[in-house]
Amino acid sequence: MARYRCCRSRSLSRSRCYRQRPRCRRRRRRSCRRPRASRCCRRRYRLRRRRY
């Protein structure tokens, strides 16, 4: 739960979330299977795609 806490909270900035919890990106497949983590994974993947 702690992994997705940062992604879900709006108070924390996106860049901060990336620095704090880089595990969400690595374990995208496993975490994305969960309904609560799907938003976090999608959000991060979208930002990563646009960036690169």
Swiss-Prot record:
Gene it is expressed from: PRM1
GO biological process, one term: sperm DNA condensation
Family: Belongs to the protamine P1 family.
Keyword annotations: Chromosome, Developmental protein, Differentiation, Disulfide bond, DNA condensation, DNA-binding, Nucleosome core, Nucleus, Spermatogenesis
The protein's name in its UniProt record: Sperm protamine P1
Primary location class: nucleus
Quaternary organization: Cross-linked by interchain disulfide bonds around the DNA-helix.
Tissue/organ expression: Testis.
Function of the molecule: Protamines substitute for histones in the chromatin of sperm during the haploid phase of spermatogenesis. They compact sperm DNA into a highly condensed, stable and inactive complex.
A GO molecular function held by the record: DNA binding
Record lineage: Eukaryota, Metazoa, Chordata, Craniata, Vertebrata
A UniProt-annotated Pfam family: Protamine_P1
CC terms in the record's Gene Ontology section: nucleosome; nucleus
Superkingdom, natural source: Eukaryota
Cited PROSITE patterns: PROTAMINE_P1
InterPro entries for this protein: Protamine_P1
Location of this chain's protein in the cell: Nucleus; Chromosome
